[in-house]
Curated annotation (Swiss-Prot):
This is 85 kDa surface antigen. CDD domains: Sialidase_non-viral. Residues 1-24 form the signal peptide. It comes from Trypanosoma cruzi. It is found in: Cell membrane. It holds the Pfam family BNR_3. SUPFAM superfamilies: Concanavalin A-like lectins/glucanases (SSF49899), Sialidases (SSF50939). It is a lipid-anchor; GPI-anchor. A lipid is attached at A691 (GPI-anchor amidated alanine). InterPro entries: ConA-like_dom_sf (IPR013320), Sialidase (IPR011040), Sialidase_fam (IPR026856), Sialidase_sf (IPR036278), Sialidase_trypan (IPR008377), Trans-sialidase_CS (IPR021287), TS_C (IPR055239). GO terms for biological process: ganglioside catabolic process; oligosaccharide catabolic process. BNR repeats lie at residues 258-268, 302-313. GO terms for cellular component: cytoplasm; intracellular membrane-bounded organelle; plasma membrane; side of membrane. Gene3D superfamilies: 2.120.10.10, 2.60.120.200.
C-alpha cells in the first residue's frame, strides 16, 4: 500500500536585533549543543526489526520477525503497561518477488510494578514474546493491513482503534479495499504462574462506525483511519478517539468518534476540521476537547465543548503551535510537538508534551519534554534523539502509578525501532517544579498579589548574567547592571534587562503570551538624564506585522509613551521625580496597547497586529533597548528595576495597586480555598478590562505534529 508524506510549511521567524533569553529551566541557560548532550533517560528497545518475535493473535506457533515498526502508543490498566506499535512485514516473498506489504498492531505486556532492571531482564529472556493484536493472514492471497493503532483505557479494559484495509491479488495485480476503522477491546487479567506478566485477552474485532449515519453520508466520507497515539477518557466517562476521514473529492478531514456507554455504541462527530488537515491529537482540558491538526501551511487548534458537534478554531490559544509562515520552509526542519497527555502531578492538573528540535550543526533531532498548567510552562530537557535528518520522530507518553514513561520511534542501524524509556529523573524534576509553582502562588496570594494568569516573576534570584524567574520558567538576560535587592540597577548607557517571552531560542520554542498581557515593574530613576531615555519597551511581532510600545523619560522630568506601528509615534506627558519609586506597566488587550504609571493610564494606542496570527515574538526590555541613533536611546543615568510581574491577561488598577502595596492577608481559616496551590479569588471588574479571567485561562504551549499522509491512492 503506497503512502505519501504530508509536509506543511514551517513558520518563518521574524529576525530581531536582540539575543534571546535562556530557556525555561531552573538550571543555567545552555547552548543547544549542551542541551542535547544532557542526561538521557533509561531506555530499552522493545520492537527491533528482525529480532523481536511476535506471536499471532490467538496464540499458536507461527512466530514471525517483523521488518519495521512505527506509530507508538502506550497505556496502563489493571497493573499492566501495554506498549503498542504498527508492525510491518517485508514486501518480498521467499522467491524475492514483490508482494503487497502487510502490517498489524503489535504489543508488549509489561508488569507496571517492575523496577526498571527487572523489566529489562525479563524482556531480554528468550521466552519473552510480543503479540499481534488485529491482523491475520487469510490464505495466500489476502492480507489485512493495519495502520496507526490508537489506544485508551477505562477501568481494566483497553480500547484499540486502528485503520484497516484488505489487500488481494487479482490476476497477479494487488488491489486494496477502502480504509476502514477497526476496534478491539481487551480485558486485562493477572498473570498465571507460568507467565512473566499479566496480559490482555482481546475480544472480537468490531467495526465501530455506522457508515450509513448522517455524519458520513452528508460529507460523502469514503475512507477512515485512526490518528495514532492516544485516545481520551473524559472525566464523565466518555471514550474519545481522533481519526481522519477522506471524502469523494479526496479531501481529508480530522474529527472524532466517541462512546458514552463503555464502547457498546459509537458516534461520529457532526463537525470536522478544515479540509486537508491531518494528524489530529486530542486531549481533555477543563471539560473541553482540544484537537490539534497539521494543515497545508500551518497548524490549527480546535476546541469543542459538545463532543465535536461544533469545533471552534482557537487562534492564539494553544500558543506552542506553529502557524502559517508564508516562507515555504519544510516542516521537517521546524519545531513541533508530538505526544500529549493530561495528568495530575503534585495535586495540579497539567499537560505533558514532547517537542522536537534540531540540534545546531548536527543531523540529529532531539526530543524535548515540557510540562504546562496552561498558565506557565517548564522545559524539562531532552529525552531522546533521532539521527535521521528527515525522519518523523514519533512518541507517546504515559503517566501512571507515579511513573512517567516515553515510547519512542527512532531510526538506528537496525532500522525503525520502538524504544521504551522510564523518565525517573525527569519526573522528579517536574514534581519539584510543580511544588515550587504551588509555593510561589501561595506566597504571592498571601500578599494580596493576584496569581490568576501570573506567568513569571523577576525578583531577587539572579546569577551568571541572568535574572531568574521565581517560577523557574522564563529567565531574562542582564547586561552591564548591578545586582540590588529584588532586582538590578542599570548604571551605564548600554545597560539593559532583556526578557524574551515568545521566541525561538536554542532550538526550543517558547510561547507564553497571546494578544493579552500585562507586565508590571517597580522602578526608581536616580538622576535626571541629559536627553530622552528609554525605560521600558515591548516589541511584538507576528508573521505579518510588528509593533513597539513603551515608556521613556526626559530631561525635563516628563514621562512619554511610545506607540509605533505603521503610524507615527504618539506621545503623552506627565512629570516624574528623581529617587521616587514608581510602578510602571505595559498592557495589551487585543489591539489596545496601554501604558500605566502607579495604576493610572498614561496613554493608549492601537497595536497594528493581525488577530488571526499569534504573537511569534514578544520582547520586554528595560534600559538600552533601541539603537543608539534613536532619539530615545539610553543616556548614562542610574535606574533601579525591581519585582517584575508578567501576566497573560489584562490587569485593572485595583490589581496593580495590590501588587504595589502587597498587604499581607490574615491567615485563612479551615474554610479557605487554595486549590492546587493556585489562588481562587474574585478579581474586581473595571469597565473595558477583562479582569475576571479564570485561573488557567490563556491556553498555553502544546502541539506541532509532522504530517504522515496515510491515505493511499486506492
Amino acid at each position: 500500500m503506497s503512502r505519501r508524506v504530508f509536509t506543511s510549511a514551517a513558520l518563518h521567524l521574524l529576525v530581531v536585533m536582540w539575543m534571546c533569553c535562556g530557556p525555561c529551566e531552573a538550571a543555567a541557560a545552555s547552548t543547544g549543543e549542551n542541551s542535547v548532550n544532557a542526561r538521557q533517560p533509561q531506555r530499552f528497545d522493545l520492537f527491533v526489526p528482525q529480532k523481536t518475535v511476535l506471536l499471532p493473535r490467538g496464540g499458536g506457533n507461527s512466530e514471525k520477525k517483523w521488518d519495521s515498526f512505527a506509530s507508538p502508543s502506550l497505556v496502563s490498566a489493571g497493573g499492566v503497561i501495554a506498549a503498542f506499535a504498527e508492525g510491518h512485514l517485508s514486501s518480498k516473498n521467499k522467491d524475492n518477488k514483490s508482494t503487497e506489504p502487510s502490517s498489524d498492531a503489535v504489543a508488549w505486556y509489561i508488569d507496571s510494578a517492575w523496577e526498571w532492571s527487572t523489566l529489562v531482564g525479563e524482556v531480554n529472556k528468550s521466552t519473552w514474546q510480543a503479540h499481534t493484536v488485529l491482523g491475520k493472514v487469510d490464505g495466500k492471497e489476502r492480507f489485512d493491513v493495519v495502520l496507526r493503532p490508537t489506544t485508551t483505557t477505562k477501568d481494566n479494559k483497553v480500547f484499540l482503534l486502528a485503520g484497516s484495509s484488505v489487500a488481494s491479488n487479482v490476476n497477479g495485480s494487488w488491489s486494496h479495499g477502502g480504509l476502514k476503522l477497526k476496534l478491539v477491546v481487551g480485558d486485562v487479567r493477572k498473570p498465571t504462574d507460568s507467565e512473566q506478566s499479566g496480559r490482555i485477552n482481546w475480544g472480537e474485532v468490531q467495526s465501530p462506525l455506522n457508515e450509513n449515519s448522517g455524519a458520513v453520508q452528508e460529507r460523502k466520507l469514503t475512507a477512515f483511519v485512526a490518528s495514532g497515539g492516544a485516545g481520551v477518557l473524559m472525566e464523565d466517562g466518555t471514550i474519545v478517539f481522533s481519526l481522519m476521514a477522506r471524502n469523494e473529492e479526496e479531501d481529508v478531514y480530522s474529527m472524532i468518534i466517541y462512546s458514552k456507554d463503555d464502547g457498546s455504541t459509537w458516534a461520529l462527530s457532526n463537525s470536522v476540521s478544515s479540509a486537508k488537515c491531518v494528524n489530529p491529537r486530542i486531549t481533555e482540558w477543563e471539560g473541553s476537547l482540544l484537537m490539534i491538526v497539521d494543515c497545508e501551511d500551518e497548524q490549527k487548534v480546535y476546541v469543542s465543548r459538545d463532543m465535536g458537534t461544533t469545533w471552534t478554531e482557537a487562534v492564539g490559544k494553544l500558543l506552542g503551535v506553529w502557524v502559517n509562515s508564508g516562507s515555504g520552509a519544510s516542516q521537517d526542519s521546524s519545531l513541533h510537538v508530538d505526544a500529549l497527555i493530561t495528568a495530575t502531578i503534585e495535586g495540579r492538573r497539567v499537560m505533558l508534551y514532547t517537542q522536537r528540535g534540531n540540534s545546531l550543526g548536527e543531523n540529529a533531532n532531539p526530543l524535548y519534554l515540557w510540562v504546562t498548567d496552561n498558565n506557565r510552562s517548564f522545559h524539562v530537557g531532552p529525552v531522546g534523539m533521532d539521527n535521521a535528518e528527515k525522519e518523523e520522530l514519533e512518541s507517546a507518553l504515559l503517566y501512571s502509578d507515579g511513573k512517567l514513561h516515553l515510547l519512542q520511534r527512532r531510526v538506528s542501524g537496525e532500522g525503525s525501532v520502538i524504544s521504551l524509556s522510564r523518565l525517573t529523573e525527569e519526573l522528579k524534576e517536574i514534581e519539584s517544579v510543580l511544588s515550587t509553582w504551588a509555593q510561589k502562588d501561595i506566597f504571592f496570594s498571601s500578599l494580596s498579589i493576584p496569581t490568576a494568569g501570573l506567568v513569571a516573576v523577576l525578583s531577587d534570584a539572579a546569577g551568571d548574567g541572568r535574572w531568574n524567574d521565581e517560577y523557574l520558567c522564563l529567565n531574562a538576560t542582564v547586561k552591564n547592571a548591578v545586582k540590588v535587592k529584588d532586582g538590578f540597577q542599570l548604571t551605564e548607557s548600554n545597560s539593559r534587562v532583556l526578557w524574551s517571552v515568545n521566541t525561538r531560542d536554542n532550538n526550543l520554542r517558547h510561547v507564553f503570551l497571546s494578544h493579552d498581557f500585562t507586565v508590571v515593574a517597580t522602578v526608581i530613576i536616580q538622576n535626571v538624564p541629559s536627553g530622552k531615555t528609554s525605560l521600558l519597551t515591548a516589541t511584538l511581532a507576528n508573521t505579518e506585522s510588528n509593533y513597539t510600545m513603551g515608556l521613556s523619560y526626559t530631561a525635563d522630568n516628563k514621562w512619554e509613551t511610545i506607540f509605533k506601528g505603521d503610524k507615527k509615534p504618539t506621545t503623552e506627558s506627565r512629570p516624574w521625580e528623581p529617587k521616587k519609586e514608581y510602578q510602571v506597566a505595559l498592557m495589551l488587550q487585543g489591539k489596545k496597547a496601554s501604558v500605566y504609571i502607579d495604576g493610572r493610564s498614561l496613554g493608549e494606542g492601537e497595536a497594528l497586529l493581525t488577530d488571526e496570527k499569534s504573537l511569534e515574538f514578544v520582547h520586554f526590555c528595560f534600559g538600552a533597548c533601541v539603537q543608539e541613533s534613536s532619539p530615545t536611546a539610553a543616556q548614562k543615568t542610574k535606574v533601579t528595576v525591581t519585582n517584575v510581574f508578567l501576566y497573560n491577561r489584562p490587569l485593572n488598577s485595583t490589581e496593580m495597586r495590590a501588587i504595589k502595596d502587597r498587604i499581607p492577608i490574615p491567615k485563612r481559616g479551615p474554610g479557605s480555598q487554595v486549590e492546587g496551590g493556585t489562588e481562587r479569588r474574585h478579581i474586581p471588574r473595571i469597565e473595558g478590562v477583562r479582569a475576571n479571567a479564570p485561573v488557567g485561562s490563556g491556553l498555553l504551549p502544546l502541539l506541532l505534529l509532522l504530517g504522515l499522509w496515510v491515505f493511499a491512492a486506492l
